[in-house]
Amino acid sequence: KKIKKLIFGFVSLDMIPLESHFRQARQKNEIDVMELDEGMVQWGLRAAAMNLPFLPTRVGLGTDVLTHNPELEYVTSPYSDAEKLVAMPALNLDIALIHVNKSDEKGNTQIVGPDPFFDELFARAACKTFISSEEVVSTQELGGNDGAIFSRFERSLVTGVLHAPCGAHPTSCAPSYGFDIKHLKEYSEAAKSFDEYSAKYLNKTHQEYIDSVGGAETILNIPLPQF
């Protein structure tokens, strides 16, 4: 058992809507959970990023999310409207691991895909942030002012940098490669018996793992999904 409690808005394997390992753990009651609306997760991370104890929000009002999470509190607006809002607590992270397209050794990063997801909030909400990067380059190669648009957070937030080409596999890292659907299906099926999958792919060096799935060239040739 690796996880004691999981706070989440949605758990999937991208192209596979229901994550089978997560489903199995929930059905067996092996983990404590706090299921939230995705907007509440975002607001909790934002509160942590701003070093606030909570942020008021309308997200979650009128839903069973609050019924199933009685620890969540309400707050009343101090202004004339006196609106009742959810006081979403900060989701303070001990550690964040973020995969990026490029970085230098100092922690300057670039995320060039079309959707940065919550990566910036993860970095700001965490006590320590570690970066795995497709490419580790010199600071000059990040492009100066022209490349700054792809830098989502300051290097001062970064604790360490790891060079991990194809490090997002079997998920995608746009624009370099897409989802490895075949591998995701294999991983999903492994919920029935994880030992075989573990022996085949885990407890290896990064390069050994890449080789076990066909090598970097195979991964880099996986097409990006079209939405």
Regions found by a protein language model. Give the residues of each.
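Conserved alpha/beta enzyme-core scaffold
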Residues: 1-227
